[in-house]
């Protein structure tokens, strides 16, 4: 009997962990960055590309769906928009990256932080990378790292 109760608690805990917390839902506009040019340099981007990326506008949008275990995500930029529909935490899917190539993408949740992992599926210069989303005061902070160089982008929630 104790084993059944323990199993039930594990299953309930796993099911509740599969839901994106409400704090992530909304539209977030890029406010400022820290160490982002250094991060892009570490990734091997040249001066011109770094300036294009640095001066582009970025918005992150997390939207609820009719299924509480799924969400929609949009990364809106002045160069290109990407939209992922019916995302399930922990389940990989194929989608287009900002570099216009196919990626295997997985969103996961750990200790209240959301992780977006991209694995490029086509040739080219794109490298595997992970973005970490967490809250820092009133900002949605997105952290990314390459070869020990961390870039941080701070997004402000729009009304």
Curated annotation (Swiss-Prot):
Gene Ontology molecular functions: lipid binding
Entry keyword set: Lipid-binding, Secreted, Signal, Transport
Tissue-wise expression: First detected in hypodermal precursor cells at the time of gastrulation. From the two-fold stage through to three-fold stages, expression is localized exclusively to hyp-7 but disappears in newly hatched L1s and subsequent developmental stages. Expression from L1 to adult stages is found in a single neuron in the ventral cord with a process into the nerve ring.
Signal peptide, first to last residue: 1-17
GO cellular component, one term: extracellular region
PANTHER family: FATTY ACID-BINDING PROTEIN HOMOLOG 1-RELATED, FATTY ACID-BINDING PROTEIN HOMOLOG 1-RELATED-RELATED
Function in brief: May play a role in sequestering potentially toxic fatty acids and their peroxidation products, or it may be involved in the maintenance of the impermeable lipid layer of the eggshell.
Protein's name according to its UniProt entry: Fatty acid-binding protein homolog 1
Source organism of this protein record: Caenorhabditis elegans
